[in-house]
């Protein structure tokens, strides 16, 4: 692990700074400045993120506490609203369920008199009906108020569920003096309202729907319903039993109405006292609160025993008309002594009412306190959980910080090593750069030589291409010459053919002349035939249809031409002459056909050679001039082609000479370049040798200067010693 804050280890620079070293140091300083700026930016961003996280955590905690406090306030408002509704509904039910003063006075008078059984039974029936009506009205009002309470407290079921199932142990809160059940009816009547009330409260606690403002309506309803059930279960009872039951019901109604009227005042006083003392539980130390489960069991047991043990206890009190059996201590303030109901019934009812009020207030305060305590414990548990999570996250962040510090230190060591490597790389780079400069110089020289060689090769290629073009031109000219020679040969052949044709036509002309001569001879013979008795038909007679008078003797009628032909046929009979003429005619037709075939052959030959054939009539007239002109044209073209051929041959020879000359120049340039390279190498070697000699000469000069200075100092010292010796002498 590297030490933090060790900084960069710079190597000592022995030599002077060069421009490259200064540039590299400037780049390194800029990189360090950028790295420091990045580190500062990262630190600032990290601080901003931490502050943002803290702010978000604070917002979450404030939001959570505000939500809890809002829920508590809403629950308190709903409880106050439900209490107000319950109070108004119970006031209405109590106002409707009150009996007239005449009934009260009659019940009191009956308690001290000994009237007959008929009046007692009638009053008992009236009390039973009144209790039945009041219980019905009370049950209706309770059901309405209970529906209102359910609608107002339905949103808080989850919040108020399990209110009295906290960590506090309620098993320690017991009755100091439990209620004892006696054999008299009055004890059961006075103990039933409390039992039913507590049973209802226990059931509400178990259901999680406890509300301080609605805890008295079920007790009232239980009181009236228990009394009605007891009245129904005992149809035959004494007058004092009926008076006691009626007076107890009336006192309970008065206590209930007074409870609803004085509830707000007593609760306010109690909260003020508890606030002054600083604790809520300290005010209920002297009051015992029963365990809910045990109280529920006791109440059920007591209710069952009272319901099923009344017939046995009915006979025990039938003979005592004007006295009450003393109540067992339902409160710590009444004690355990026996007292008469006729002496102080209102005091016992007021004490019982105070006890109920106090217990209801205690239960209300206890419920609120336990609810607040439960919420505080939940919030405390959540805060502790958040604190643990924060501690864990802080530990993780601390570990991450230590790891990052370790990584930073290792990275600093790596950076130092990299800087050392960078310095080494810079030195190697300088050496390589110098070597690169030398290689670049050599490369530039070689590039110059290469350019020269490329230029020579380019010129050679140009000459070769030009030679190829000239060779192509020569080949084309040779082909043209060959073509001209072929055309000349073709023309010569054509001229020979025309000459032969001319000879053939000359023969035909001779034959024509001969035929003309023969025709004249035949005409003469015809004339001679007329002389021998042959009739010559004149030329104007058509088909010899002239009517001639028959002449004496057998004379054949022929035309003049036929007569000439017959004369030209020779002498002899007419048949022989005609046969001779027919043979001559066939020979002439065969000759004509032969001439036509020759003429067609000549025309086809002339069409193949792209030349026009002359008309036989034209050939007869001007064939010599055409042949002469064609010969002149052919001779002129031949001479022209010969001139071109000679000229192209001269060009070829000149180009070949140029190629040879250029090749010689390329060879000379190559040899000159090689010689120049050799000279350059020699000059470089000479330069290096001279530089070495210069360095050695400079070194020698420095040594000589040093020796000279040393000698001068010795000379001065010797002079000083000499002057000192002379001065001493």
Curated annotation (Swiss-Prot):
Superkingdom assignment: Eukaryota
Annotated segments matching region Disordered: 80-156, 230-268, 289-344, 600-621
Compositionally skewed regions (Basic residues) per UniProt: 84-93
Record's keyword terms, sorted: Coiled coil, Developmental protein, Wnt signaling pathway
Biased composition (Basic and acidic residues): 115-126
Coiled-coil residues: 27-69, 357-531, 574-722
Signal peptide positions (record): none
GO molecular function, one term: LRR domain binding
Biological process according to GO: dorsal/ventral axis specification; regulation of DNA-templated transcription; Wnt signaling pathway
The keyword Kinase is assigned to this record: no
Annotated function: May function as activator of the canonical Wnt signaling pathway upstream of ctnnb1/beta-catenin. Might be required for dorsal axis formation.
Family as reported in the entry's similarity comment: Belongs to the LRRFIP family.
Name by which UniProt lists this protein: Leucine-rich repeat flightless-interacting protein 2
Lineage: Eukaryota, Metazoa, Chordata, Craniata, Vertebrata
């Amino acid at each position: 692990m590297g030490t933090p804050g060790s900084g960069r280890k710079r190597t000592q620079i022995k030599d002077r700074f060069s421009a490259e070293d200064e540039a590299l140091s400037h780049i390194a300083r800029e990189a360090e400045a950028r790295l420091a700026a990045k580190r500062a930016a990262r630190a600032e961003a990290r601080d901003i993120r931490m502050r943002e996280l803290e702010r978000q955590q604070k917002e979450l905690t404030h939001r959570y506490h505000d939500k809890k406090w809002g829920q508590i306030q809403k629950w308190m408002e709903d409880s106050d609203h439900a209490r107000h509704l319950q109070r108004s509904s119970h006031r209405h039910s109590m106002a409707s369920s009150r009996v007239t003063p005449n009934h009260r006075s009659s019940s009191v008078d009956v308690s001290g008199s000994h009237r007959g059984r008929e009046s007692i039974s009638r009053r008992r029936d009236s009390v039973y009906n009144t209790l039945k009506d009041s219980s019905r009205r009370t049950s209706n009002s309770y059901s309405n108020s209970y529906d209102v309470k359910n609608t107002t407290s339905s949103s808080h079921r989850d919040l108020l569920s399990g209110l009295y199932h906290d960590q506090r142990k309620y098993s320690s809160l017991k009755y100091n003096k439990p209620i004892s059940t006696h054999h008299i009816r009055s004890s059961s009547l006075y103990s039933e309202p409390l039992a039913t009330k507590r049973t209802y409260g226990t059931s509400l606690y178990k259901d999680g729907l406890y509300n301080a403002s609605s805890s008295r309506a079920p007790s009232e309803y239980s009181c009236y319903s228990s009394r009605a059930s007891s009245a129904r279960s005992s149809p035959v009872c004494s007058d004092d039993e009926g008076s006691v039951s009626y007076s107890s019901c009336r006192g309970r109604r008065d206590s209930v109405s007074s409870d609803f009227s004085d509830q707000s005042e007593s609760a306010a006083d109690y909260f003020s006292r508890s606030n002054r003392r600083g604790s809520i539980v300290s005010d209920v130390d002297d009051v015992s609160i029963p365990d809910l489960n045990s109280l529920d069991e006791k109440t059920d047991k007591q209710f069952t025993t009272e319901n099923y043990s009344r017939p046995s206890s009915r006979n025990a009190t039938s003979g005592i008309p004007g006295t009450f059996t003393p109540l067992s201590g339902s409160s710590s303030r009444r004690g355990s002594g026996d007292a008469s109901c006729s002496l102080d019934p209102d005091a016992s009812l007021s004490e019982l009412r105070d006890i109920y009020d106090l217990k209801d207030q205690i239960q209300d305060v206890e419920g609120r306190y336990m609810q607040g305590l439960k919420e505080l414990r939940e919030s405390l548990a959540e805060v502790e959980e958040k604190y643990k999570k924060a501690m864990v996250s802080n530990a993780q962040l601390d570990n991450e910080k230590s790891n990052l510090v370790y990584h930073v230190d290792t990275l600093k060591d790596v950076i130092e090593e990299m800087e050392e490597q960078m310095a080494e790389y810079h030195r190697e780079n300088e050496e390589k750069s110098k070597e690169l400069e030398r290689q670049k110089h050599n490369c530039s020289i070689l590039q110059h030589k290469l350019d020269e060689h490329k230029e020579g090769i380019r010129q050679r290629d140009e000459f070769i291409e030009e030679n190829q073009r000239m060779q192509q031109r020569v080949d084309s000219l040779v082909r043209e010459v060959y073509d001209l020679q072929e055309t000349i040969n073709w023309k010569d052949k054509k001229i020979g053919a025309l000459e032969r044709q001319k000879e053939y036509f000359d023969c035909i002309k001779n034959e024509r002349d001969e035929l003309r001569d023969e025709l004249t001879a035949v005409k003469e013979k015809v004339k001679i035939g007329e002389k021998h008795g042959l009739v010559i038909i004149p030329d104007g007679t058509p088909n010899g249809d002239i009517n001639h008078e028959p002449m004496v003797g057998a004379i054949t009628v022929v035309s003049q031409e036929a007569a000439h032909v017959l004369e030209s046929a020779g002498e002899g009979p007419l048949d022989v002459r005609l046969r001779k003429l027919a043979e001559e005619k066939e020979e002439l037709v065969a000759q004509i056909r032969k001439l036509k075939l020759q003429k067609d052959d000549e025309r086809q030959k002339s069409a193949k050679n792209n030349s026009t054939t002359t008309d036989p009539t034209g050939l007869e007239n001007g064939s010599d001039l055409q042949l002469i002109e064609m010969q002149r044209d052919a001779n002129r073209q031949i001479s022209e082609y010969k001139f071109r051929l000679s000229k192209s041959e001269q060009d070829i020879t000149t180009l070949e000479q140029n190629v040879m000359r250029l090749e010689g120049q390329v060879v000379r340039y190559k040899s000159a370049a090689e010689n120049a390279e050799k000279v350059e190498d020699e000059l470089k070697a000479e330069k290096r040798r001279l530089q070495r000699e210069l360095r050695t000469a400079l070194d020698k000069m420095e040594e000589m200067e040093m020796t000279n200075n040393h000698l001068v100092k010795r000379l001065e010292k010797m002079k000083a010693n000499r002057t000192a010796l002379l001065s001493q002498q």
